[in-house]
Amino acid sequence: MNQVDLDSTHRKGLWAILAIAVVASASAFTMPLPAAANADPAPLPPSTATAAPSPAQEIITPLPGAPVSSEAQPGDPNAPSLDPNAPYPLAVDPNAGRITNAVGGFSFVLPAGWVESEASHLDYGSVLLSKAIEQPPVLGQPTVVATDTRIVLGRLDQKLYASAEADNIKAAVRLGSDMGEFYLPYPGTRINQETIPLHANGIAGSASYYEVKFSDPNKPIGQICTSVVGSPAASTPDVGPSQRWFVVWLGTSNNPVDKGAAKELAESIRSEMAPIPASVSAPAPVG
């Protein structure tokens, strides 16, 4: 006859009851899950931290028929970001490269690619400019310049017949004719003549351009552009020297005159002469 261990039976029954209770509690916990899955989640407690607002994006609707630009538009997430530390672009100084000629009493802006040369040997004018073609091989030596083009500037004084013309248009044409004979003393035919109005810095003027087709076919076509700016001297003797200046730009078909640059050069001329003081009249007699 087998003897029953009451303690063992009691323990087994206790574990069975606990197992059934665990299973029952698990069933009681897990069964409502499918129903709770479709329910709204419980609201989270409010946070004390303030979230950073998301950057607003501007939505731009193009007009019908408007061309589509390939550049990045405002609000484009692919647009490059601006560097707050980037330097602001510097404004271009219109007087950069300005040169003052004390002998002629004027200043001008040096054209790009040109250098000032020795002018003491000039028969007319007080400034000689040469076109640079390469830098000097040795530091300190003069720049290598072209030999078939040059620019001469100076005061339109009585050395030049053109100074007798009070009208700047006529003075520029006369100057071009005289300088053409002086610098291009070869037989030929003048072609492609032009008159170019000038006005800048309150100084009116005119330019005359033409080309010379030489009789010698081996010579390249010559080109000359002469400009006159300023006002002719008054008839009174105390007004000082002439307030007119000239520019002569010489070139060839191999190294042509830049008419746009010639216009800018002439229009950059400014008077650097001291104003003539007004004469002081004697006081009227009292009586």
Swiss-Prot record:
Residues 1-39 form the signal peptide. Its main location: secreted. It comes from the Bacteria. Keywords: Repeat, Secreted, Signal. Residues 40-56 have a biased composition (Low complexity). GO terms for molecular function: extracellular matrix binding. InterPro entries: FAP (IPR010801). Residues 40-88 are annotated as: Disordered. Sequence repeats lie at residues 76-79, 83-86, 93-96. GO terms for cellular component: extracellular region. It is found in: Secreted. Residues 76-96 are annotated as: 3 X 4 AA repeats of D-P-N-A. Belongs to the Apa family. This is Alanine and proline-rich secreted protein Apa. It comes from Mycobacterium leprae (strain TN). The lineage of its organism: Bacteria, Bacillati, Actinomycetota, Actinomycetes, Mycobacteriales. The gene is apa.
